[in-house]
Amino acid sequence: MKPGITVLLMAGGFAIASVLAVPLARAADVFILSSPAIQDNGTLAIKNACSDKQRSPNCVGENVSPPLAWSNPPDGTKSFALLLFDPEGRAPAGVSHMVVYGIPADVKGFAEGELSKPSDKFVGGKSLMGLGVYTGPGTPPNTDWHHYTWTIIATDLDPKALQPGLTRDELAKALEGHVKGSAGLVTRFRHPT
């Protein structure tokens, strides 16, 4: 071998050995939001779409919230907030489909449909539709996919610290200095016609 290649291979081996010696974060330590029904970037079912045809003719579903679960929240977490946002809806502002918070730290998820109605497990905020519970997608016909960003936020606030009815922006302001970490999941939906 030429000396240049030998030196290069030795340097490469040293670099690999150095990288392998660095402790890596275990996946088990990462704060994760998931759904047993939908993979990240997966599609929401028709039943997850909004159902109030009087409010929007684009509603084609049953307004059943998908099941969600989270694991490995940061140390010191006292409560969670959970948001659902569609950045493509009503462009350029986007649509806030759900704002809930005050979720106790011992809650690790919600069953299918559980976020579609008031619960002792969360404080209802105010979505764009003025509701404190889940409102599913209502995309117009003949439009491209919309992306629905689910965000779980770990906070150091007591579950009863915030008043009901906060909008997404009001919640963001109230959480300043109290966020321990967050995790997200993206789902997609488009009108079936």
Summary of predicted features, one role per range:
Residues 24-193:
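N-terminus-centered regions that define maturation/targeting leaders and the start
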Residues 1-5:
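Positively charged n-region of N-terminal signal peptides that target proteins for export
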Residues 6-7, 145:
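Short hydrophobic/aromatic-rich motifs at helix boundaries and adjacent loops
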Residues 8-21:
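Bacterial N-terminal signal peptides
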